[in-house]
């Protein structure tokens, strides 16, 4: 499949993408990063509907859409009829009736998108910008692009995902596709936050058991909005037991990379001074987020033709 020939009706989960489609999106993102341009003769209207706070995902989608020449339809949850009790379904039904081509949605409800993509009335394409603790496909794709740019492969790579596993949509999206692409996965973090579903994809370890051998060390944000972690750990204890300290950073392979979906709780998951350290690719992940989201929007618009 050519990287610019992929066409998707919606993009709501990594599970709905074939390996071939995943690689096409990654390679198209790299092409955009290297300067590829696209021009649309017809108008394309995109609306970003974020029902949870977001900086990187929301703004990266906006930049991606602007770079593609799309027209952005503003949506502010605070001033919308959501505050009158309007359901998500009726909000998107309205967008569809208005002729919006693509809705990028972040919502706290897991699997919110199912009734939208199954509706015979809603014709707007849906891109999932994150559903509660469920899936985060665009973050997963930018992570994959970052890893692929670094190593040129996934097969045989050792990847450790560490932190607040149970509450992380990033962990769930990444574990599924990385295993499918041939990576060897390890999961680290507090036992209280790691359910058995992760055991189907990799091995439970401590950070110290694998820090010297992994190619990718991916830390996850402690999601304090979804639970009260300080009732279990102080910030200092969490960092000492489960975070990236200078001592652990020094033990990483010279060729290994450090990743985090951000925002980073500095001195909790990662020591403050290591966020931009030489092995860190956290800023690169943000940059890649624009280009892989250009590939996503392009593919979804192509799927509407």
Swiss-Prot record:
GO terms for cellular component: cytosol. Carbamoyl phosphate binds at residues 56-57, 106, 136, 139, 262-263. Signal peptide: none annotated. GO terms for biological process: 'de novo' pyrimidine nucleobase biosynthetic process; 'de novo' UMP biosynthetic process; amino acid metabolic process. GO terms for molecular function: amino acid binding; aspartate carbamoyltransferase activity. It is an enzyme of class 2 (transferase). Its EC number is 2.1.3.2. PROSITE patterns: CARBAMOYLTRANSFERASE. Keywords: Pyrimidine biosynthesis, Transferase. The keyword Lipoprotein does not apply. The keyword Protease does not apply. It comes from the Bacteria. It catalyses: carbamoyl phosphate + L-aspartate = N-carbamoyl-L-aspartate + phosphate + H(+). Heterododecamer (2C3:3R2) of six catalytic PyrB chains organized as two trimers (C3), and six regulatory PyrI chains organized as three dimers (R2). NCBIfam families: asp_carb_tr, PRK00856.1. Belongs to the aspartate/ornithine carbamoyltransferase superfamily. ATCase family. Catalyzes the condensation of carbamoyl phosphate and aspartate to form carbamoyl aspartate and inorganic phosphate, the committed step in the de novo pyrimidine nucleotide biosynthesis pathway. This is Aspartate carbamoyltransferase catalytic subunit. The lineage of its organism: Bacteria, Bacillati, Bacillota, Bacilli, Lactobacillales. The gene is pyrB.
């Amino acid at each position: 499949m050519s990287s610019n020939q992929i066409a998707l009706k919606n993009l709501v989960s990594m599970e709905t993408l074939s390996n071939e489609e995943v690689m096409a999106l990654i390679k198209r993102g790299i092409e955009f990063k290297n300067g590829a341009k696209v021009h649309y003769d017809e108008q394309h209207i995109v609306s970003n509907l974020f029902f949870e706070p977001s900086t990187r995902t929301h703004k990266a989608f906006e930049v991606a859409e602007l770079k593609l020449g799309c027209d952005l339809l503003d949506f502010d949850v605070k001033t919308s009829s959501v505050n009158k009790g309007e359901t998500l379904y009726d909000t998107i039904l309205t967008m569809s009736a208005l002729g919006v081509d693509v809705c990028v949605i972040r919502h706290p409800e897991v699997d919110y998108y199912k009734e939208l993509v199954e509706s015979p009335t809603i014709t707007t394409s849906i891109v999932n910008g994150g559903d509660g603790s469920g899936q985060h496909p665009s973050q997963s794709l930018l992570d994959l692009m970052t890893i692929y740019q670094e190593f040129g492969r996934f097969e045989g790579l050792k990847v450790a995902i560490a932190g607040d596993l149970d509450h992380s949509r990033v962990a769930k999206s990444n574990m599924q596709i990385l295993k499918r692409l041939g990576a060897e996965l390890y999961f680290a973090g507090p036992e209280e936050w790691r359910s058995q579903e992760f055991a189907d994809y990799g091995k439970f370890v401590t950070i110290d058991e694998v820090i010297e051998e992994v190619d990718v060390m991916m830390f996850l944000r402690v999601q304090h909005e979804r639970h009260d972690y300080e009732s279990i750990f102080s910030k200092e204890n969490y960092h000492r037991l489960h975070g990236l300290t200078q001592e652990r950073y020094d033990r990483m392979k010279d060729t290994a990379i450090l990743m985090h979906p951000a925002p980073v709780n500095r001195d909790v998951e990662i020591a403050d001074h290591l966020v931009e350290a030489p092995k860190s690719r956290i800023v690169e992940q943000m940059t890649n987020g624009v280009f892989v989201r250009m590939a996503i929007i392009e593919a979804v618009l192509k799927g509407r033709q």
